[in-house]
């Protein structure tokens, strides 16, 4: 079997293969919506100033957000670092990539969801900052895809409960976990 694609010499169209679907608009923004119900993406923009760079991370008047922040964490992932698959039952995560390149893998584990068992992958970071809203019940994991540390901010709508954590983890190698990370 050859990896070479034959071209029709009259039309320059390949005889085999699948056309890529649109992923970005002509303005450089994502052209696709999240594939999981309740997951939302807010495109953020770096603003160059005479003294450097400004990035708005969160505003309570953004129409796609609608929460009162109760806790904010900054996370620095080591080069190649990977988190466990995890989900929350009460907490909504609001993740903003601020440095590096981070791959966010999502898997809908909500039995009553219209998108149950659907997966999605969203990339974000310093070059392409986005706010990604992950609702309760959606399994998610993150991978630093770069060779340098990568950082993200997580804005919670529920404070972390030290005595009764709303964090449910899957052990590495758990059968049935999607291979998308």
What is each residue range found by the language model?
Residues 128-141:
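Conserved SET/PR-domain catalytic core that frames the SAM/AdoMet-binding pocket
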Residues 2-128, 145-181:
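Non-catalytic, conserved peripheral segments adjacent to functional cores
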């Amino acid at each position: 079997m050859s990896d070479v694609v034959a071209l029709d010499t009259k039309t320059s169209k390949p005889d085999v293969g699948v056309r890529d679907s649109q992923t970005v608009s002509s303005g450089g923004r994502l052209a696709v919506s999240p594939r999981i119900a309740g997951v939302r993406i807010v495109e953020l923009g770096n603003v160059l100033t005479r003294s450097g760079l400004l990035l708005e991370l969160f505003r309570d008047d953004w129409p796609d957000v609608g929460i009162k922040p109760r806790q904010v964490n900054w996370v620095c992932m080591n080069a190649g670092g990977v988190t466990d698959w995890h989900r929350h039952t009460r907490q909504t995560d609001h993740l903003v990539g601020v440095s590096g390149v981070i791959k966010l893998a999502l898997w809908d584990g909500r039995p009553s969801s219209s998108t149950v068992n659907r997966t999605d992958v969203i990339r974000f970071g310093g070059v392409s900052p986005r706010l990604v809203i992950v609702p309760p019940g959606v399994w998610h994991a993150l991978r630093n895809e770069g060779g340098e540390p990568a950082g993200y901010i997580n804005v919670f709508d529920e404070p972390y409960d030290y005595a009764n954590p709303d964090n449910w983890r899957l052990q590495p190698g758990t059968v049935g976990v999607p291979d998308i990370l």
